Amino acid sequence: MTSRKKVLLKVIILGDSGVGKTSLMNQYVNKKFSNQYKATIGADFLTKEVMVDDRLVTMQIWDTAGQERFQSLGVAFYRGADCCVLVFDVTAPNTFKTLDSWRDEFLIQASPRDPENFPFVVLGNKIDLENRQVTTKRAQAWCQSKNNIPYFETSAKEAINVEQAFQTIARNALKQETEVELYNEFPEPIKLDRNERAKPSAETCSC
């Protein structure tokens, strides 16, 4: 039986400060929730081994700062990502409105080979709170308008839909990683012009 090489999937979590990016990551990886998280400075990551369709993969989940002054740190962190998770707070409409700019910024900084089909997943977090402002319908409509991005409503505090969301994230990231590997292994062939190939060698003679 041939041993398959280990797969490392790089996942980036983006969204405004305070939407729960760190809480979601810690709930998924460590099954813990805390109200005491400080704002992330720069970026931090956690890893978790998961089974995706009978394949063991290591997810490297990057939690980036949501403050605007840290957005310029993006390039190094975004490059090589296999999936991007966009998070907003369902009780804070402004965090939903900025999803467009987070998505655009990621595509500019990460420069994926196929931006149209790059896998995103959107999480509407804090559904355990009562003062909801962004409806499910509104969030789903936005996701559909962006090439049908998968959408999950989550609560990092109550561990609602966190596991399911990250299963989809892992599956989509693995698909992206596999496609990139195939592309690198079999790049597009260089097409020679028919006339170029048919040129007689006599043409190069200077006599």
Swiss-Prot record:
Localization per record: Late endosome membrane; Lysosome membrane
Lipidation (S-geranylgeranyl cysteine): C205, C207
PANTHER family listed in its UniProt record: RAB FAMILY, RAS-RELATED PROTEIN RAB-7A
Binding residues annotated for GTP, in chain numbering: 15-22, 34-40, 63-67, 125-128, 156-157
Keyword Signal (UniProt): no
InterPro entries: P-loop_NTPase, Small_GTP-bd, Small_GTPase
MF (Gene Ontology): GTP binding; GTPase activity
CDD domains the UniProt entry points to: Rab7 (cd01862)
Induction: (Microbial infection) Down-regulated at 6 hours post infection, and then up-regulated until 48 hours post infection in spleen cells in response to Singapore grouper iridovirus (SGIV) infection.
Residues carrying Cysteine methyl ester: C207
SMART domains per UniProt: RAB, RAN, RAS, RHO
Pfam families, per the entry: Ras
GO CC terms: endosome membrane; late endosome; late endosome membrane; lysosomal membrane; phagocytic vesicle
UniProt-recorded name of the protein: Ras-related protein rab7
Mode of membrane association: Lipid-anchor
Assembly behavior: (Microbial infection) Interacts with Singapore grouper iridoviral proteins VP69 (ORF69) and VP101 (ORF101).
Family of the protein in this entry: Belongs to the small GTPase superfamily. Rab family.
